[in-house]
Amino acid sequence: MSAKPATDDAKDELLSPFRRLYALTRTPYPALANAALLASTPVLSPSFKVPPTQSPALSIPMSRVFSKSSTARIGITTKTALFFSTMQAIGAYMIYDNDLENGAGFIATWSALYLIVGGKKSFSALRYGRTWPLVLSSVSLANAVLYGQRFLATGFQ
């Protein structure tokens, strides 16, 4: 009988960091942290254009034919960073204004949208030694999961 409570205590200790993070979603602090990271991106890790690699003669990939720009970018642009930072700050204000359900849904949605826009680029930035986009994607993923769980746990009442 004493072995079972010991395993429950160990399980609680293992899950306690996740419970603490989930408890933080009652506050606007994780969203404000993400907004601050995104807003500081143009200063800490500005995006730059990567020159295209030379392809063999008469071999033009179709993605280059229909692409808007001829050079790829590493990292997110200043406009994108400030836009998503503003959206995170608006969601944080919603939670600060005691609208937990809508604020959590708003933050989860915009965090997921950031992952759609910048998630793949964050992995390609690793080839050029840039880890900041991966940090931003990781924090956005954590916000999307935690605030999304908070939003879905409300039961849509």
Curated annotation (Swiss-Prot):
One of its GO terms (cellular component) is mitochondrial membrane. Keywords: Acetylation, Membrane, Mitochondrion, Transmembrane, Transmembrane helix. Belongs to the AIM19 family. It is a multi-pass membrane protein. Disruption phenotype: Increases frequency of mitochondrial genome loss. It is found in: Mitochondrion membrane. PANTHER family: ALTERED INHERITANCE OF MITOCHONDRIA PROTEIN 19, MITOCHONDRIAL. It comes from Saccharomyces cerevisiae (strain ATCC 204508 / S288c). The keyword Mitochondrion applies. It comes from the Eukaryota. The gene is AIM19. Its main location: mitochondrion. InterPro entries: AIM19. Signal peptide: none annotated. The chain crosses the membrane at residues 31-48, 80-96, 103-119, 131-147. The modification N-acetylserine is found at residue 2. Coiled coil: none annotated. This is Altered inheritance of mitochondria protein 19, mitochondrial.
